Amino acid sequence: MSSTVIILIVVLLVILVAFYAFAILMRKKTEDRILALEERKESLFDLPVQEEIDSVKKMHLVGQSQTIFREWNQKWLDLSSNSFADLEEHIFEAEQLNDSFHFFRARESVADSEAQIEMMEGDVEGIRQGVAQLVEQEKRNSNKIQESLDLYDNLRSDIADNADLYGTVITELEKHLANIETEFSQFVTLNSTGDPIEAAEVLETAEEHTIALRAITEQIPSFIKTIEKDVPKRLEELQEASDKFIAEDYILPENVNLKERMDDLQHHLEESSSLLEQFELDRVEAELDLIQERVEELYSIFEREYSARRNVEKRSSVLKEYIEHIRVNNKNLLLEIDHVTQAYILSGNEKGYVRGYQEHLESLDADVDEIIANIEAKAIPYSSLSRRVNSVVNALEDIEKNQIKISETLSGLRDEERAAQEIAERFDSELRTIKRYVEKCNLPGLPKDYLDLFFMTGDRVQNLFKELGRVRINIDTINHLVDVSTEDMHVLKEATTNLTDHAVLAEQLIQYANRYKASNEQVAQGISRALQLFENSRDYDGSFDEISKTLEIVEPGAASRISGVYFKNKPTPDYL
C-alpha cells in the first residue's frame, strides 16, 4: 500500500473522530439546556398560583374588583391548561431531535421553548402581582378607613364646637359634612360586598374632601371676622370721614360720586359674604382686596383735598403781595434800563421783555382775583384751586428770576466796560514793548507779513479804544473786539518770538560757520545764501534753515547745540 493511501486513510479517520466528538459535544450542550428547561417548567408549575386564586375567590369580590379578578383567573386557566401542555410538547420534540442528532433543529426547538417559558414566567408573575394587589387593597382599605374616619370625626367635632366662628356659613359646612358622610357609607358598602378597588377610590375621594373641607374651615373664621367686623368698621369710619369732609366745606372732584362709591363698597361686601357661603375663597379674597383698595383710594382723595387746602390757604394769602412785589421790581427795572441806555446800547431787547412781564402780571392779577373769589364761594375742589395757585406762583417765580437776570446784566455792563478798557491799555503797552524789543535786535528790516500782522493788531486795539470812547457803548461790539484783539496779540507775540529767535540764531550760526568757509566750498556757498536771505530778503526763518543745513554737512549736531545754548541763556522778553 502506498504512502499516499495511508495518509488519506489517516486523515479520514481524524475527520470522523472530530465529527463524532463534535456531535457528542453538541448533543450534550442541547441536553443540558433541555434539562434546564425541565427544571424551570417544574418550578413554574410548583408555584402556588392556584392556591392564591382560590383564597381571593373566598373574598366574594364584586364590581370592578370582580372584573379584574376574572381577567387574572382566565389568564391563569389559559396558562395552566394550554401553555403548559404546549411547552411539554416543544420540550419533548427537542429531546427527540437531539437524540437523533438533528442538532440545529434541536437548538431551534430549545430556543423556542426558552422564549415560551420566559413569556409564561412573566405572565405568571403578572397574575400573582395582580391577585396580590387585590388582597393588599382590601387590607389597605381596612387599615385606612379608621384613619379617614378619625379625620372626619375630628372635623365634625371642631365645626360643632366652634359653630359661632362660622356665622352663616355653618349651614353650607354641614351640607358638605353630610356629603362626606355619604361617601364613607358608600365605601363601607362597596368594601363589605367585595369591591375593594372601587371602595378604595371612594375612600380616597372622601378623604380628599375631608382634607379640603378642613383647609376651608381653617380660613373661614378669618374671612368671617373681616367681612362681619373689620370691613363694616372701616366703612363706618369712612362714612364718618366723609361726613366730616362735607361738613368742613370740602368739594370733591366731579368724577368722584361719594354716595355711589359707598354703595359700591357695600355691594362688594355683600358679594364677598355670598361667595364665602359658596366656598369661593379665592374670589372672596379678591373682593376684600378690591374693597381695601377702593377704601384707600377714597382716603387718598380726602388727603389730597386736605393737603390742597393747606397749600391754597398758605399761598393764596400772599399772592397779591407777591404780584405787587414783582410789579415794583418791574417798575424799578424799567427805570434802570432807561438810565443805562444813556451810556450803553442794549441789544438783548431787555426793555421789551420787561414790558411783557408787566402785561403778564396784569393777567396773573386777574387770575388771582378769580381764585380768591372761588375760595370764598367754596364751589370748587381745593385740588383744582391748588393747581391754579401753584401755576400763578410758578409764573411769578419765573418772572422774578428773569428780572434778576436782566438786572445782573445791566449791573455788569460797567464792569465789562472797565475790564475792556484795561485790556485795551495793556495791549497798547505790549505793542510798544514789542516794537522796542524788535528794534533792539538791529535787524536790516522786517518781513512784510510780520509788518502786516503788527499793524493789523495795532488797528484792532485802536478800534477798541474808539468804541470805548463813544457816548453810548455797544458792549457786545466791545466784547467782540476784545476777543479778536486777544487772539491777534497772541499770534503777534508768537510771530515776534520766532522772528527774533531765528534772526539771532542765524547770525550766530553764520559766524560759527565762517571757520569752515575757506576750507569747504559748500560751506562758503551756504553762508552766501544765508546772508542773501538775511540781509536782502529779510527772510530770517529761511536764513536760519539754510545755515543750519550747511553746518550739518561739516559738523553734524552743531546747529542744535548752538540753538540749545541760546534758548537756555535767553532772557524772557518784556512783552511776554
From Swiss-Prot:
Coiled-coil positions: 105-134, 254-305, 356-402
Sequence intervals crossing the membrane: 8-26
Side Extracellular, residues: 1-7
Keywords: Cell cycle, Cell division, Cell membrane, Coiled coil, Membrane, Septation, Transmembrane, Transmembrane helix
Pfam families named among the record's database cross-references: EzrA
Biological process per Gene Ontology, one example term: septin ring assembly
One term under GO cellular component: plasma membrane
UniProt subcellular location: Cell membrane
Membrane topology: Single-pass membrane protein
Residue intervals on the Cytoplasmic side: 27-576
InterPro entries in the record: EzrA
HAMAP family listed in its UniProt record: EzrA
Primary role: Negative regulator of FtsZ ring formation; modulates the frequency and position of FtsZ ring formation. Inhibits FtsZ ring formation at polar sites. Interacts either with FtsZ or with one of its binding partners to promote depolymerization.
Membership in a protein family: Belongs to the EzrA family.
Protein name: Septation ring formation regulator EzrA
Designated gene of the protein: ezrA
